[in-house]
Every structure is written in structure tokens, then in C-alpha cells.
Design a protein with these regions (language model features):
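Alpha-helical solenoid repeat scaffolds of the TPR/TPR-like class and their adjacent stem/linker regions
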Residues: 1-576, 581-649
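Short, solvent-exposed alpha-helical surface patches in well-structured domains
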Residues: 426, 524, 666-667, 705-708
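Short, well-ordered alpha-helical scaffold segment located
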Residues: 454, 674, 702-705
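Helix-turn-helix/winged-helix DNA-binding modules
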Residues: 514, 656-657, 695
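Ser/Thr-centric signal marking residues that sit
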Residues: 582, 674, 699
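A short, Lys/Arg-enriched interface patch at domain edges and termini
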Residues: 641, 700-716
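Polyanion-binding surface elements
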Residues: 651-677, 712
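Major-groove DNA-recognition helix of helix-turn-helix-type DNA-binding domains
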Residues: 668-696
Length: 716
């Protein structure tokens, strides 16, 4: 046949750059020369020669086959299938033809046809390792792990030095949790070719899965040494350093990734996590935003960014981020929880309560999910039905939302409450509740049920309809053996540490560590000689009194508390409670006693934003942290407020300025145990609506107004 001399070349336009005459060569010589061009990447010359062979010998199977293979390399799959299929028709017993046809069909996603081609290849040559390997790849992509592993086993049996088969066998074994066998497969691949970075990387993944961290680090480093731009290996190595707390080392590795590719979303996210942990919130926000712009497909970056935006009080932006996350994954419960926390924080109660129902799918709250035989109450009138209200999450949540028992009570409905054993005697003081059952004991018959924190949604609570009449809880018994009788001083209860062991924590809502304060930070308050402080702590934080040598400043009451009724008995004898955001703060507010609550910058949704009073507890005053981790200003403000109270005239202070409705009734000559329902119902709103009563306690003028009101009401 005639063709160009192999010294000739064509430019990009296909024009000849040589005037030399063509030479006569055989078909086989032309085919060999085409294969050489093909293998060296000179594809244009290879195509030209394959084509000329077919011009001379139209049914030449090898030329058809190789031209089809070359076409498939450039994505011309249909043409490739036609050429290779025609080659098979002309020479059906060539196993490599069937194997390469299978490869093209696989590339097109025609898995079943591809498997048939590979099987036809193996029918001709059962020991063709490449066909077993390719068949395993199809099985693996279809999720048929057992068949894939079997195919890879046959591939390495046919060719023990087939590196790819060893690696893929390791992958399938890892997917089957056969980790030791996977390690052996990867190590065999490395033994054949130590420079295959993928084998080292996969080996590192298995070591990490087995918590063999040092081996994983070594394997990842080996992969990186052989492939310095191996982004996956760098990311995993950075992750290990981050988890181990080597944040500087992790940052260095992540930055190496970004120097290779600046838009790796996972790396940007990981850098955001590091900055977040180090308190560099601005940098963390920047990295999270860049990760989202890079198109990350996971929602955890949105969750973290939403949390930080909420912490910076950029609530509208946080809502947008959470909604964006729901576009990616509408069923991510943590995103719904994050959205709920922001909506509730800014007062969007209707949507916020709806989103909060996703808590039952949240990993942190799954232990609190309950299954009941009877239906979930839908908020419709109860009539004479029996409803089971069950507490969920922490003590504070139960105390706050048990108020709704009074809201749904009527003359016919029977209310049963199931709660933590520590709350039973306390909740039994509510007249609206027929029976209180400790959690874990058998339940009586009931018609419908509802968790306490679903009641605001069911009852359509908004900012203007929060049931905030206090007290709605009272001491279990009128008499107590605990007597705090020191009329010479202002008696102040103190709680400085949140107990994360007893109350559920959800990082999307708030964390106990940020709510707690070192007892030492209160030291300046202990210098007030007019005050006697009593510890209401019941956990290990009580030892702080001894550690900081405050035994002469603080009387430890918590050691004698077994239930919240014990705590209640103490609180009722105190003039004031100062507490971080704990169950004691809720309890004090529910008892209608004065409570000063100390809040971190990122406070829980129930305290809203920029308020110094509580919509839930009229007798509560909020002291807000201005800077994360810095409680100095908060303590200073408490000191100023204490000074004002003392200067108002202790110890007679609470004879003329009182917080409790019970005390108000006593001052105007009405027994708290006997005053009429209309007095309780109408007097509380009267005082709470008093625009001059900004400090949330009754003055002499308030008492005079109350007396005049009661007199007019009774005379009418």
C-alpha cells in the first residue's frame, strides 16, 4: 500500500510539511506503524494509517478494532461500538475485542451489555486478568460487592502482579468491613509497585478506620510523597491533625491543598472549623462562605455558618443560609433545628415551632423520642378526654413548659404528666394536673399525648400570648426543715455552673460550657457585707467552694437537695437568686421569686435578643454577656444592681418592694391560699401591664393600686 514516509508530518490543519514522495509499505507494516503512533500519543497519524488500512482491506478486524478503541478514547463511543462489533463479526474468537467492547459499553453506562462482553471474553480466555478486572469494576459500580470481590480475586489469580486488581479488591473488602483483608490487598499492591500513590492512600483510610492513627499518617504521607498534589490524602492528613488538636499542623496541610486548588470545598470547610475552634469567628465565617461558593454538597458547612451568623446576631443572614441548606437536603434535621433556633430567637414563633418539631429526628435528641400507642394530640378541644403530657430534654425545659397544663385545663379534661422523678413532687403542686408519673413507671389509660415542648405550637403561642402568669409552681409542703432565718442580711441563692450531665445539650441551640462561669469571677460580690450567699449547686461544681476557699462566704445548700422540691423550699426563703441559664433559673421564675439570670453572648432562643427582661418569667432580670468568654462586665452590672437594692433599705427591702404575687396578696390582706380565681386572673395582668413597673417588682405605689383595685372589684 502507499503511505507517507514516517519522516513526514502533518501540521494542525492536516497540510503536508514534506514534499517527499509516498512509499510502498505492506498492510501489516502500516498497522504496526499505526499502533506505534497510537501508543506514543500521536493519534492523528494513527487514525490516518488505520483508515488507509481499511481502505485497502475493508474487513481487516484488527484495524477496525484499534480504530474503534482510539475513537472511544476521544469519546466517540457509538462509532467505537460499531467498529469493534464489526471486528468481532469478522473475527469472533479474539478475546481482547470482546474485552474492549465491554470497556466502551461500560463507559456509556450500558452495564449489562458490558458484563456480557466481558463474559464472552472470558468464555474464550478464562485466564484473561484484564477481563476479570473490568468485570469487577462493573459489578462494583452497580453495588454488587460480592460479585466484584469474586471478579477481582480471579483477576489477581490470573495475574498476581495486577496492581489495579489488588487495589480494587482492597476497596471492596473495605466496603464489606473486612479491614484486615483489605490491608493485605493494598500491601500486596504496594509490594508490586511501591510508587502507586492510590494504594498508600487507601491503606491510610483503612488504618484510620481502625484507629491506627500513626499508621494512617504514615500511609497518607507516603501517598503524598509519591503524588504531592494528592488532594484527598492531604485533606485526610489534615483531618487527623485537626482531630488530634494539632491545629497549626492541620492548617499548614490544608493551606497546601488550597495552594494546589483554591476552591476545594471540604478543605475550606475544615479551615473554617479550625478558626471556629480558635475563636476566630470572622475568619471562620469567611472560610465557610468560600466553601459554599465552591459548591460543597454537604450541609454541615451551612449549619456551622448559620450558627456563627446567629452568634453574631445576623439573624436574617442565618435564616437564608439554613434555607439554602434545605435546598440541598430538605430532610437534614440539624438544619431544621438550626433554623428553628434562629426563628424562635427573632420571635417568628409560628414557623419556629413548626421547624422545632424536627427535633425528634436530630441525633442529639433521638434518646428523648417516645413511641406511644395513643395518638398525638392535634390541638383540638379536649372536652372530657385524658391527655398525657410528657417531659422531654432537660429539667429547665420541663419546668418552663409545664405552665401549659394550666392553659389547657378546664373543668372536664384530665391531665396526666410523666416527668423525671426529681420533678414529681414539684409538679404535683399544680391544681390543673390530676396525676404525675415518674418516667419509667407504668402509665394509666389516656386518650391523647403531647410532649411539653410541642404545646406552644399546638396552642399557637406567639409573642403576645405567652402564658406568663406566675407563680404556677409552689412548694410541695408548707413546712420545711430547712430554715434560712437571717433577717440581718439579704439572702441570695447562687448557681454558677450548668450541669451538662443532667440536661441535654444541642450545639445548635447552646452549649453548657458557654453558660457556666467560674465561681472565682463572683468574688467581688462576696464582699457585700449586707448579703449572705447560698449555693444551690447540686453537681460536682459544689467543690469550687472549697477549691477557692469561699467556705466562709457561701453556705452550701445543694448537698442536702434530693429533688427539686428541696430546691424549691430553699428558694422560697431567699430574697433573690442569681443563676446562669440552668433549671434553677426556670424554677425560681416559675415560683414567682426574683431571679437574675446571666446569659452568654449566644443565649438560648427563649431569652430573645437584646432584652433585659423575660417574656416567660415576669420576675426575671437578664444580665447579658457582651463579649464571648468575658463575664467581667456582667458581674460589674450585678454589683451595681445589688448596691441599688441594698441602698433601697435592707433588711426591710422586700417588705416594700416585692416580687411574688403571693407576697403582694399578703400585703393587701389576702391569703395566697384563699384569694379568688378572679383576683389571681385579673391582678397579675394588671401589674404586668403597668408601664412604670420596668424593674418587675412591686413598689409601695403598686401595693396601693392593688388595694384600691381589690376594694373596687369586691364592692362591685
Amino acid at each position: 500500500m502507499k503511505t507517507r514516509n514516517d519522516q513526514d508530518r502533518l501540521d494542525a490543519n492536516g497540510d503536508s510539511t514534506s514534499d517527499r514522495p509516498v512509499e510502498e509499505i505492506t498492510v501489516e507494516d502500516a498497522l504496526q506503524r499505526a499502533v506505534r503512533y497510537h501508543n506514543t500519543g500521536e493519534f492523528g497519524y494513527a487514525v490516518e494509517l488505520y483508515t488507509k488500512v481499511l481502505e485497502v482491506s475493508p474487513n481487516h478486524p484488527e484495524a477496525m478494532h484499534l480504530l474503534g478503541v482510539l475513537g472511544s478514547q476521544f469519546g466517540q463511543h457509538e462509532e467505537a461500538i460499531g467498529l469493534i462489533s464489526q471486528a468481532i463479526e469478522n473475527s469472533p474468537n479474539q478475546p481482547v475485542y470482546h474485552c474492549n467492547l465491554g470497556n466502551v459499553l461500560h463507559a456509556q453506562g450500558k452495564f449489562e451489555e458490558a458484563k456480557q462482553s466481558f463474559q464472552q471474553c472470558l468464555d474464550i480466555d478464562p485466564n484473561m486478568a484484564e477481563a476479570h478486572y473490568n468485570l469487577g469494576c462493573v459489578f462494583e459500580q452497580q453495588g454488587e460487592v460480592e460479585d466484584a470481590a469474586q471478579a477481582y480475586h480471579k483477576a489477581v489469580a490470573a495475574n498476581p502482579k495486577h496492581v489495579g486488581a489488588h487495589i480494587n479488591l482492597g476497596n471492596t473488602l473495605q466496603g464489606q468491613s473486612k479491614l484486615e483483608e483489605a490491608i493485605q490487598a493494598y500491601q500486596r499492591a504496594i509490594g508490586i509497585d511501591p510508587n502507586v500513590a492510590e494504594a498508600h492512600y487507601n491503606l491510610g483510610c483503612v488504618f484510620e478506620q481502625q484507629d491506627q492513627i500513626s499508621d494512617a499518617v504514615e500511609a497518607y504521607q507516603n501517598a503524598i510523597d509519591r503524588k504531592p498534589d494528592y488532594i484527598e490524602a492531604l485533606n485526610n492528613l489534615g483531618n487527623i491533625h485537626r482531630v488530634l488538636g494539632d491545629l497549626d499542623e492541620a492548617t499548614q496541610v490544608y493551606q497546601q491543598v488550597l495552594s494546589i486548588s483554591p476552591d476545594v470545598g471540604e478543605t475550606l470547610y475544615n479551615l473554617g472549623v479550625i478558626e471556629h475552634k480558635q475563636g476566630q469567628m470572622g475568619k471562620a465565617v469567611e472560610y465557610y462562605q468560600r466553601a459554599i461558593q465552591a459548591g460543597v454538597s454537604f450541609t454541615k458547612v451551612h449549619r456551622n455558618l448559620g450558627y456563627l451568623l446567629k452568634e453574631r446576631q445576623e439573624l436574617n443572614e442565618a435564616v437564608q443560609i439554613y434555607r439554602h441548606a434545605l435546598d440541598i437536603d430538605p430532610n437534614d434535621p440539624e438544619v431544621h433545628m438550626g433554623l428553628a433556633s434562629v426563628l424562635l430567637l427573632r420571635g417568628d414563633f409560628e414557623e419556629g415551632w413548626e421547624e422545632y418539631e424536627w427535633r425528634w429526628e436530630s441525633e442529639s435528641l433521638l434518646p428523648f423520642k417516645r413511641d406511644f400507642i395513643q395518638p398525638f394530640w392535634d390541638g383540638s378541644p379536649l372536652g372530657d378526654k385524658t391527655i398525657l403530657l410528657h417531659a422531654e430534654q432537660g429539667f429547665g425545659d420541663a419546668i418552663q413548659f409545664i405552665r401549659y397544663a394550666d392553659t389547657i385545663a378546664n373543668s372536664k379534661v384530665n391531665i396526666i404528666v410523666e416527668c423525671q422523678p426529681e420533678l414529681v413532687t414539684l409538679f404535683e403542686t399544680m391544681d390543673s394536673i390530676k396525676q404525675v408519673i415518674p418516667r419509667g413507671e407504668s402509665l394509666p389509660d389516656y386518650d391523647v399525648h403531647a410532649p411539653l415542648l410541642s404545646l406552644p405550637r399546638l396552642l399557637k403561642t406567639d409573642l403576645d400570648s405567652i402564658p406568663n402568669q406566675v407563680p404556677y409552681l409552689s412548694p410541695a409542703t408548707p413546712e420545711t426543715t430547712m430554715i434560712l432565718d437571717d433577717p440581718s442580711k439579704l439572702k441570695i441563692g447562687l448557681v454558677w455552673a450548668a450541669d451538662s450531665d443532667s440536661e441535654v445539650e444541642n450545639w445548635l441551640m447552646f452549649a453548657s460550657a458557654s453558660r457556666s462561669i467560674e465561681l472565682l469571677d463572683f468574688a467581688t460580690l462576696f464582699d457585700f457585707e449586707a448579703c449572705q450567699f447560698y449555693s444551690l449547686q447540686v453537681d460536682s461544681a459544689r467543690t469550687d467552694i472549697i477549691i477557692y476557699d469561699f467556705e466562709d462566704k457561701i453556705i452550701d445548700l445543694g448537698a442536702s437537695f434530693d429533688t427539686f422540691s428541696d430546691t424549691t423550699a430553699a428558694i422560697m426563703q431567699l430574697d433573690l437568686v442569681i443563676s446562669v441559664d440552668t433549671a434553677v433559673a426556670h424554677l425560681t421564675g416559675a415560683l414567682g421569686k426574683p431571679i437574675w439570670t446571666l446569659l452568654p453572648v449566644l443565649a438560648d432562643w427563649r431569652w430573645m435578643l437584646n432584652r433585659f427582661d423575660s417574656l416567660w418569667y415576669p420576675t426575671m432580670k437578664l444580665f447579658r454577656q457582651e463579649e464571648v468568654g468575658n463575664w467581667d462586665t456582667v458581674i460589674q452590672n450585678i454589683g451595681i444592681e445589688l448596691t441599688r437594692l441594698i441602698e433601697d433599705g435592707p433588711p426591710q427591702l422586700f417588705e416594700t418592694q416585692i416580687y411574688s404575687m403571693n407576697e403582694a396578696m399578703q400585703l393587701i390582706g389576702i391569703s395566697p391560699n384563699t384569694y379568688r380565681n378572679w383576683e389571681r386572673r385579673e391582678l397579675v395582668p394588671l401589674v404586668q401591664r403597668d408601664p412604670g413597673n420596668n424593674r418587675r417588682y412591686f413598689t409601695k405605689v403598686d401595693i396601693q393600686h392593688l388595694q384600691e383595685f381589690v376594694s373596687r372589684r369586691r364592692n362591685s
